[in-house]
Amino acid sequence: SGLKSVTVGFLMNKSAGWDEDVYASGTNHSTSFMGAMAYEATVNGYSGSELGDPNAFDYMPWKPVVGYQSGMISTFGGYDDQFVGASEVIYDNGEVAIGGPLSQSYSRNVQGGKYDYVFNIGADISDFIYLGANLGISSFDYVYDELFKESAIDPSDFQIDMANGDRMYFKDMNYRYSYSATGTGYYGKFGVIVTPGYGFRFGAAIQTPTVNNITEEWQMSGETSYTDTGYNGYTPSPYGSGSYRMVSPFRANFGLAYTLGQLGVLSADYEMCDYGQMRYQ
């Protein structure tokens, strides 16, 4: 009778992983990344004076700000709300199109993993009551990086005439987006099994809400090069960041089992979990 045994354990496990490396390239005669960016800036009603504002990152979407301030897109024709990409030319009839073939490449790299650390303890009391407890800590890290490159196969196809009379030609551009997230969480699991005899067995367990503290960070940047290096541009955005807490719901399990000699086992289980309790803080 009394306490018969105690067991203690520790588990460390990588329960998820992210490992991705993608690369694609080719020649495009029809469309360009910067042309698409210029089109989006035009249809969304942005203006060059807004995108060029030194404080634009405080109130404008970052992608067109990076594009405009790094020289990927610009206004034309005396309009402040009409944009053209550095890879596009404006013909005499007003048509806007890419000046010639472009070499394009896209790469994406993703790294990260989720790790669990669990300390557990169990006790046997008189072969009648069995107690168990798990204390767990989880952590994860995630890093995402993508890069789009575009370069002129023949820069002379991409003539740009500046308002001051200067003439230059587009050479290449890079657009990068980076994102990272880290987080830690903690939880507890506690359970009991009672075996009163006569083939019966009762069990109950609870899991505390899992509290996950998550921090995110992101940035984008643009770089554009021309034959006249005096017009080259590079603009990084500020680092954006955010921290929040995600709380999963409380969970409880109850079970009853009865052994029918050597014929089999009858059991019933009930789980209680209110997902409406999940919340961000």
Map each language-model feature to its residues.
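Outer-membrane beta-barrel porins/channels
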Residues: 2-281
